[in-house]
Amino acid sequence: MAGKLVSLVPPLLLAAVGLAGLLLLCVPTQDVREPPALKYGIVLDAGSSHTSMFVYKWPADKENDTGIVGQHSSCDVRGGGISSYANDPSRAGQSLVECLEQALRDVPKDRYASTPLYLGATAGMRLLNLTSPEATAKVLEAVTQTLTRYPFDFRGARILSGQDEGVFGWVTANYLLENFIKYGWVGRWIRPRKGTLGAMDLGGASTQITFETTSPSEDPDNEVHLRLYGQHYRVYTHSFLCYGRDQVLQRLLASALQIHRFHPCWPKGYSTQVLLREVYQSPCTMGQRPQTFNSSATVSLSGTSNAALCRDLVSGLFNISSCPFSQCSFNGVFQPPVAGNFIAFSAFYYTVDFLKTVMGLPVGTLKQLEDATETTCNQTWAELQARVPGQQTRLPDYCAVAMFIHQLLSRGYRFDERSFRGVVFEKKAADTAVGWALGYMLNLTNLIPADLPGLRKGTHFSSWVALLLLFTVLILAALVLLLRQVRSAKSPGAL
């Protein structure tokens, strides 16, 4: 009798496994797609000095995930920024054609219609809008006409506010560095514990500082609330118009003409003819404009390599004596104390990189940055040219910009030696340029969800069919074995 029971165990086990498998296969599942094709997005960063085009890419089925958008290609538009075409708006649109033609080559043809195309203009156009709203509208109209002629999904050309520029730069940096969320080795999304880092951007006409803060801002205009992946962020941000690299240089030039009749920040042995109209045509130098002057006149100006006088000239850009709040950065703007790590990009990066690679000077501390700036400012024109043969365009201005950066960080934003150790100067993160453009596109295309992505598990249809057949075969095999056991038990020779 015991032998009969033992002989029934194998077919019963097979039947149990088969039935369990069939029951599991009947549980509702999610469809799992095959490896997806790529989607693309294009952003034109219309800055004050030039326009850059960025083409981004991501898996087509990851519209609401993260850690997957990267830079596919980029293109620098020849010529100045679109605001420089205020007197001939049609040229603003024409200037974009070469890079847009590259976009046609970089994006697969079958993806043209689904590729969003954005143009965002920053401080250069904000300045133009202050002096000539009519010219601003015509420039935007001209670039819109050009962009709509291309087969992409054009979604508008607009002027970003300073707050937008700061916040989107902060989003870009933290997104690329996976500070919001990352895909862990266990196969699911996790929230890193390292926290976010602040972002500092130095453009041509404005500079922005943005960082997460725990306390409410005393000035509501400087506070932004974001909800990303189920996490709330209170962010401080401020944009200083007229404190971008190019506008700072214009303001220093106007001050040098007014105070010295020579330029202490320029290297000794360098001189040039300065057209007064170009110095005073910007809204940023309007307060320094003489009551009467010949706009078509030119003035010869020479450099003196005087670091001390250059420092005094730059210091005049910052008003740190007046503050209507409990604490300020400069010009009466509220700012909480800087804390945590920061990434500084754009002209911050290029200037500090010059000090490190061309001048061969350390810049790891505020004191080293100050010393490197002073060393650069004391160089003659011949000494600078010997270091970078053939480079003429930006070489005379590295002293002034480096001096401005040191003053901005130490006197303006109130970094000390301890907090400065958390500042890194970078051009890219995860092989993607750091700036507002990616954050802008992520926001407008809803590629960053407000809540944490859900975890889905599914089975490919072909695998599901194979398992169904396997478990069916197991059940049939079990039935065959049971029938054989029963017949064997009923046979005359069975015990």
Curated annotation (Swiss-Prot):
Q: Which residues bind ATP?
A: 204-208
Query: Which cofactor(s) does the record list?
Result: Ca(2+); Mg(2+)
Q: Which residues lie on this side of the membrane: Extracellular?
A: 26-462
GO molecular function per UniProt: ATP binding; nucleoside diphosphate phosphatase activity; ribonucleoside triphosphate phosphatase activity
List the EC numbers from the record.
3.6.1.-
Q: Does the keyword Isomerase apply?
A: no
Under Pfam families, the record lists: GDA1_CD39 (PF01150)
Residues on Cytoplasmic side: 1-4, 484-495
Q: Which Gene3D superfamilies match?
A: 3.30.420.40, Exopolyphosphatase. Domain 2
Q: Under which main EC class is this enzyme filed? A: hydrolase
| One Gene Ontology cellular component | basement membrane
Q: Which InterPro entries match?
A: GDA1_CD39_NTPase
Active site annotation, chain numbering: 165
Kindly list every residue the record annotates as glycosylated: 64, 129, 294, 319, 378, 443
> Which keywords accompany this UniProt record?
ATP-binding, Calcium, Cell membrane, Disulfide bond, Glycoprotein, Hydrolase, Magnesium, Membrane, Nucleotide-binding, Transmembrane, Transmembrane helix
Biological-process GO terms, alphabetical: G protein-coupled receptor signaling pathway; platelet activation; purine ribonucleoside diphosphate catabolic process
What transmembrane ranges does the database entry give? 5-25, 463-483
The disulfide bridges present are 75-99, 242-284, 265-310, 323-328, 377-399
Say yes or no: keyword Disulfide bond present: yes
Factors inducing expression: By dioxin.
According to its UniProt record, which protein family does this protein belong to? Belongs to the GDA1/CD39 NTPase family.
According to its UniProt entry, what is the function of this protein? In the nervous system, could hydrolyze ATP and other nucleotides to regulate purinergic neurotransmission. Hydrolyzes ADP only to a marginal extent.
UniProt name for this protein: Ectonucleoside triphosphate diphosphohydrolase 2
Gene designation: Entpd2
